[in-house]
């Protein structure tokens, strides 16, 4: 009798905890619930980076968005337009021979949602990310390989930030 009371109490407390997490808007990390009007989009990217465009398409598809070509879109299909990505560097550290050893790189861009007739509905909104690049005084091939992998991660972060921000679009 006593054992079943303890088990019942534990299950009851666990159920209360689960319901309270759900009630407060708890979502799994990376899960995005986009408005239904944004589930079908056309994409116009002037980012200047194929790596970002690829990361953005992957992030949109993971969020449940179907991306149409503009020729297949109708008047109810919105267009996601991404402007050119800008990059800025700040030197953070130098070695004894005055060579840069650490750089903070910041990537930013603006995007907006347009109707089929070109009128903007949401935006322009800024997205940005920054990261510290170390080992800039290494050999050229090592630094290039490191920087390439870091840039790829930054583009993925930027795309994830854009998709996450779309979650709050009042459409």
List where the protein language model places each region:
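Soluble non-cytosolic domains of exported or imported proteins
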Residues: 46-54, 100-104, 141-157
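Short acidic low-complexity segments
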Residues: 65-76
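Short secondary-structure boundary/capping segments
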Residues: 32-33, 72, 119
């Amino acid at each position: 009798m006593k054992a079943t009371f303890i088990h019942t109490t534990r299950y009851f407390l666990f159920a209360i905890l689960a319901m309270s997490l759900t009630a407060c808007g708890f979502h799994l990390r990376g899960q995005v619930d986009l408005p239904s009007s944004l589930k079908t989009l056309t994409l116009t990217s002037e980012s200047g980076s194929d790596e970002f465009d690829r990361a953005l398409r992957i992030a949109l598809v993971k969020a449940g968005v179907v991306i149409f070509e503009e020729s297949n879109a109708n008047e109810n299909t919105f267009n996601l337009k991404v402007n050119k990505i800008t990059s800025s560097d700040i030197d953070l550290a130098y070695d004894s021979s005055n060579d840069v050893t650490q750089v903070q790189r910041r990537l930013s861009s603006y995007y907006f949602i347009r109707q089929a007739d070109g009128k903007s509905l949401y935006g322009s909104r800024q997205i940005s990310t920054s990261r510290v690049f170390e080992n800039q005084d290494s050999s050229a091939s090592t630094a290039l390989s490191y920087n390439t992998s870091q840039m790829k991660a930054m583009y993925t972060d930027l795309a994830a930030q854009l998709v996450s921000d779309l979650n709050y679009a009042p459409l």
